[in-house]
Amino acid sequence: MDKLINAMKIYFATNFSYYTKSHGYHVNVVGPDFYQYHKLLQKVYEDAQENIDKIAEEIRTLQSVVPFSMDRISKLSKVPDASDTPKALEMIKELLFDTEVVCECIRDAHSLATEQEAYGLVNYLEARLDEHYRFQWMLRSTLEP
């Protein structure tokens, strides 16, 4: 159970960082296709934001505390921090990479939840994977010439 709890905490922190980055990109994107990027980034950050509490509740269901300090979240997160404000297409490329990182965290937690026969959590994680695969498709499609 400890491995599953740790995997969920990593997923929580990674999702939190993913939310912060995608929201930051949403408010800072500029360029000729501003509206298109702005709306896509809004979809991404709203989904990540909506799931912060849901992931936290899953951790609490496992009878553990949720990381809440920025220091702890940044140490657990697998999403690299944004050091500057890139151009719009670079934002999309970075978020495509970050989305795969989030998916890896979900798959790790899913594998452990399956071993623990935590089927409600398994179902939730499968739904999250489906949503992130959809975002990968949208982000990849945006990068096509």
Predicted regions and their residues:
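Alpha-helix capping/hinge segments and adjacent helical runs
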Residues: 14, 60-68, 98-101, 105, ...
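Long, well-ordered alpha-helical segments
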Residues: 8-27, 58, 102-112, 135-140
